[in-house]
Amino acid sequence: MASDNDLFRVLVYDLAAAKGDIVMLPGRGEMIGGSGLAALLFAKYGEVAADALDPGQPIIFAIGPATGYFPLMSKTVAGFKSPYNGFYAESHAGGRSALALRFAGLDALVVVGRAKRPSVLVVGSRRLELLDTHYLWGADVFTTGKLLRKIAAGSSGHRSIMRIGPAGENGIGYACVNVDTYRHFGRLGLGAVMGAKNLKAVVVQGDADLPLPVDKGYAKLFKAIHEQVTSSGMMAKYHDLGTPANVLPLNELKSLPWRNMTATSDPEAAKISGEAFADELLMHNAACSGCPVGCIHIGMVREKFSDAHRFAIHQVAYDHEPNFAAGPMLGVTDPAEVLAINDMADRQGLDIISAGVALAWAVEATTKGL
């Protein structure tokens, strides 16, 4: 008979019934990481023939067995049927999501059904509640996050808020899920799946203790992994300029799409390079919980709100892919404008990569009078 250490501990929550149950599931020695667990759970709870937005389709948030125990293990895997392509999909996000699940005593959360009214699901080791939050429907992701930090109060270090914006509420096929402000479940429409379930947000409260291995071998292994990760040149690159460091090399290789892919390089690439963003707009770095790299780069967008030259400052996370979609794909070479476009898409809960590509087509079509 398998012990609890050999089993996955999964919370399965039915939004329609407003009820959840803990399921102990075998397979820990067979599945690889959060991806393996998410696939296993979709095979158990998913409906292959049903539409992606069918209430019976599950949303799965899963973590791997090393999460919480070793550095870098900071990603949660979301498994779902994609409204974008109609297939099983994975999306990965960090922030505090993975450690929050671990400190809530869970390997995975499975959400099925459709809530009667727009709702927020709050999950913790000692709390399970579905809140009627119809008043948040229509709110952007930043307003939603700000309010939920008060509504579902908890220790911010071990609390994760995964929420959608109007894009998800309206079933946009590439709506994403904002995770703790600066990270996202992007690309394949998880936001639309949450919207179809009347699920505005999931708040995970990591409110339990996490017993660590007591043998000396564990401490030595942890230290060795930490030292290897933090001393590598690749990790230094991600901490310094981040993925925007790729802009100039890609442009030189003629592999940087410009103006809806009508060109593959441009002499103005230096204006939107990683160096330019760092010199002009970078405010600070941030890190996902449990990760020593600190690869999240947060820039600033100034928004004028008074003729007397008064400005509000928005903090906007940036990476190469969002910058490419809101920059060279649109022919935009001002870093401040790139971040402003990123910020507008992010507020609505749109995947900026898909949104930028769609905008690039629209810009070219308009330019050509189509």
Question: Residue spans of the language-model regions?
Answer:
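Intrinsically disordered, low-complexity segments enriched in small residues
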Residues: 1-92, 96-370
